[in-house]
From Swiss-Prot:
Name of the gene encoding the protein in the UniProt record: rpmH
Highest taxon in the source lineage: Bacteria
A Pfam family assignment: Ribosomal_L34
Protein name in the entry: Large ribosomal subunit protein bL34
GO cellular component: ribonucleoprotein complex; ribosome
Example of a GO MF term: structural constituent of ribosome
Coiled coil location: none
Phylogenetic placement of the source organism: Bacteria, Pseudomonadati, Pseudomonadota, Gammaproteobacteria, Alteromonadales
Length: 44
C-alpha cells in the first residue's frame, strides 16, 4: 500500500508557507494567532 505522505518541499511551501499565509486574510489571522501564542516557527 502506498503511504499518504509523499513529501515535496515545493508543495509544502506553496500551501503552508509564509507567503501563502500572507496572501489571504484568514492566513494572516493564522499568523497573528501563532504570534500571540508565542510560536517559534510561524509557518512551514
Amino acid at each position: 500500500m502506498k503511504r499518504t505522505f509523499q513529501p515535496s518541499v515545493l508543495k509544502r511551501k506553496r500551501s503552508h508557507g509564509f507567503r501563502a499565509r500572507m496572501a489571504t486574510k484568514n492566513g494572516r489571522k493564522v499568523l497573528a494567532r501563532r504570534r500571540a501564542r508565542g510560536r517559534k516557527v510561524l509557518s512551514a
